[in-house]
Amino acid sequence: MEKVFSLFFVLLIVGCAQNEPLYDYDIEKKINEMGLKVPEPSTPIANYVPAVSFSESGKTKLVYVSGTGPKTKEGTYITGKVDQDLTIEEGYGAARLTALNILGSLKGEIGDLNKVVRFVKVIGMVNSTPNFNQQPAVINGFSDFIVEVFGDRGRHARSAVGLVSLPSDIAVEIEVVVEVLN
């Protein structure tokens, strides 16, 4: 009886130690089915890294992704001020593209986007004219894309702010904090 109990206990521990999948679909496959591809992480233009992980141990950790912009697959950036050089819809598209670039940095840090437990915090910065007040409508491009890909795990706390300039005149810059499996 003691051997049976020991075997049961070992099987219970092994069974509990395995992580259940978070999604009933593959995140990257879903992105590919949308006609998109997760890019490689961008090379930083200064003395920083694209993403940093933080964990005090446990099942999950936080990943902080550096400010990222709307880099196209051709390697250029969408630039200009929303409400002057770009429409709200074009800014929305730039934020959506930035979401894809952020996933590239995130994948570079964690290896597998299926490890994403949830998006925690998003800070969206919009290069806009001083009187423009529709920054949330622009950053919705990011939020809508992330929720489309990750479902409810993509819902996040968010700030959307306007700035009179961004580095290299990019249209948007977005930072995120993401909880992932360790």
Per-region residue spans from a language model:
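Sec-dependent N-terminal signal peptides
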Residues: 4-13
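N-terminal presequence-like segments and the immediate start of the first folded domain
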Residues: 16-100, 104-120, 128-182
